[in-house]
Amino acid sequence: MPPKSATNATSRRAEVLEAALELLADEGYAGASLRKLAARLGMAQPSLYHYFRTKEDLVEQVLATYAGQMFQALSPDQLPTTLEDVPRVTVETAVRVYQRPTHPLFVRVAISVSRVNPRFGTLMRRVFVEQATWGIQQMMKPFVERGEIDADDAVDLVRMLLNAIGLRLIEDKVMFAAHEPGPDFDRYVRFVIATGHAQLAALAAQRD
């Protein structure tokens, strides 16, 4: 068990980063400042220098932290065990990620800052393209190795599913005034999963 002081420090850092995320989501990069963050937290601004020295450091830590949480959404015991499971597991995982109150805020911040500074854009490309592709490849590796699907098709399939459900969730929770998905959301989820199954069937037919 970690010492109580270490646990308290970890908890305090998480509190600071969540407040920073909310500030960036509310006011954007231009409107956010360490002074405003300190005011939200009820602490002296110099105390924030224990966590980050500049606003750029703040943004990078926020992006890295919440990107890490996003990738932790699918635990090893939840991985699909059959190719047929892939569409359902992929879509359900994306929906579950957006059920975290902080994730829509993270996506809003990631989109808004990616063009502000090249270092933020590079970090977000690494997260949403390079790391995401690597994660997809690892999830699909057993099926590729068994010859059930080509490597490129495996990545394209999962990306198609993630983009289809992700854009709908961005519309509901990020781009416009946040609101719960409409009554057609469950139908849309079923449609996306069924489309994934149809694509798997089409790919299998091409291989026969």
List each language-model region with its residue ranges.
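Hydrophobic/aromatic-rich alpha-helical bundle segments in the mid-to-C-terminal region
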Residues: 122, 126, 130, 141-194, ...
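Amphipathic alpha-helical interface segments
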Residues: 19, 23, 93, 164-168
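Helix-turn-helix
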Residues: 15, 19-57, 61
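Residues in soluble alpha-helical coiled-coils and helical-bundle/repeat scaffolds
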Residues: 53-57, 61, 98, 115, ...
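N-terminal intrinsically disordered/low-complexity leader segments
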Residues: 1-11, 22, 175, 204-208
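Short, basic, alpha-helical segments at the C-terminal edge of helix-turn-helix-like DNA-binding modules
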Residues: 64-70
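Hydrophobic alpha-helical connector segments
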Residues: 61, 74-107, 151-161, 186-189, ...
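Amphipathic alpha-helical segments used for helix-helix packing
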Residues: 99-126, 170-175
